């Protein structure tokens, strides 16, 4: 089993739900990315999603767009992100790392070269936002051959055919985008999420992580009641944007620990 599969199997055995925080590599400071990744793990992350900055992040809201712009301005590239993962792996061989980004940087490197470099760095999963599952069979096969889980998005608007297409190519987990629009949007409707997850699980035999619109411990706990994992990104990127640099890692770890406690509370049966 992959590191991601092992993580979700352990969570299921313990009756717990997963916490998947996202940060953008290189933001606010490329020299601090590995430290921030360790802060996420120390706060209780089960999987870390590491954003690969891109100049036109069409699925992302203004908070993550700004983080991409800052990282690119400081020279962050796909190669430097892979170096960050490799340095993280020197201390942490347990926490899975998923790269989340767009097709263009991967295609510039070439899928085969990327798969080899990502494997060697210690990457566990890849989510390419603009790769539709129907057109991703070759890419997904190359990732799996390198021991990397190809992860795909589903949304409230996803048809049964799209869900089935994801089921044919995805492994690790599925990321369910709980809202129409871009990351960071508000007005989360947990009941609508609960209604969609059975349709996903009937066609995709994988854990379902839910993200977009989760901003605090209360919403994280509510989502954990119905999903296998909670994905949170914009709120963390905003925290880093506003934090005093010397305090950023500690504040990040503290906020993630609050989310962890809330999610663990949701996973426990009532006394």
From Swiss-Prot:
Swiss-Prot/TrEMBL catalytic activity? (1S,2R)-1-C-(indol-3-yl)glycerol 3-phosphate + L-serine = D-glyceraldehyde 3-phosphate + L-tryptophan + H2O
Q: Where is the active site?
A: 49, 60
Q: Does the keyword Lyase apply?
A: yes
Kindly report, in one word, the top-level EC class recorded for this enzyme. Answer: lyase
Alphabetized, the UniProt keywords read:
Amino-acid biosynthesis, Aromatic amino acid biosynthesis, Lyase, Tryptophan biosynthesis
The organism's place on the tree of life at top rank: Bacteria
What is the annotated quaternary arrangement, including any partners? Tetramer of two alpha and two beta chains.
Function, as annotated, reads: The alpha subunit is responsible for the aldol cleavage of indoleglycerol phosphate to indole and glyceraldehyde 3-phosphate.
Q: Which HAMAP family does the UniProt entry name for this protein?
A: Trp_synth_alpha
Q: What is this protein called?
A: Tryptophan synthase alpha chain
| UniProt source species | Burkholderia mallei (strain ATCC 23344)
